[in-house]
Regions:
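Core dinuclear metal-dependent hydrolase active-site scaffold
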Residues: 1-63, 122-153
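Cap/insert and terminal regions of metallo-dependent hydrolase folds
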Residues: 48-125
Length: 153
């Protein structure tokens, strides 16, 4: 569907029974005039490979939110290569119990595509903006405002 000049498209697989509830997640591809953003939800690498086989070039995006908060079961080489992002975002809470993002996922991202990697557990809220003159810009809230309690060990 469209919202002004922005198109939103649901990304999903064949819809067969899911062994893993996370694979029931659907993704969202947001395409704006100067950038695109893929939010894959909590899908596993297996579901990502199905998306790549089905959606192919439509998965291309300038910004990729890593699946499942940077879990080691997600963000496959296949997805990274087809999306080909300039930026990768990790949405994870600071000091979360699951240890997200996993080091092997960060290494996989860096080995597969040359991206700028932002992590909400370190950078705080991340804002995305884009203009014809300045192109795509992402800002980190913690570079703008950092309360004292976040600086504690």
């Amino acid at each position: 569907w469209r919202w002004g000049s922005t198109e939103l498209m649901i990304i999903n697989g064949p819809g067969q029974g899911e062994q893993d509830r996370n694979d029931g997640s659907c993704g969202l591809l947001v395409t704006a005039p100067n950038f695109s953003l893929l939010i894959p939800g909590d899908v596993s690498a297996r579901r990502e490979r199905e998306w790549v086989r089905y959606w192919r070039d439509e998965l291309s995006a300038s910004v990729l939110v890593l699946a499942h908060h940077g879990s080691r079961t997600s963000t496959s080489h296949a997805l990274l290569k087809w999306v080909g992002p300039e930026w990768a975002l990790i949405s994870a809470g600071r000091g979360n119990a699951f240890g997200h993002p996993h080091r092997e996922v960060i290494d996989r991202v860096r080995q597969t595509v040359p991206v700028s990697l932002l992590d909400t557990s370190k950078d705080g809220a991340i804002s995305i903006s884009s203009t014809d003159q300045q192109g795509l810009q992402l800002s980190r809230e913690r570079t703008v405002w950092s309360p004292y309690w976040l600086k504690l060990p």
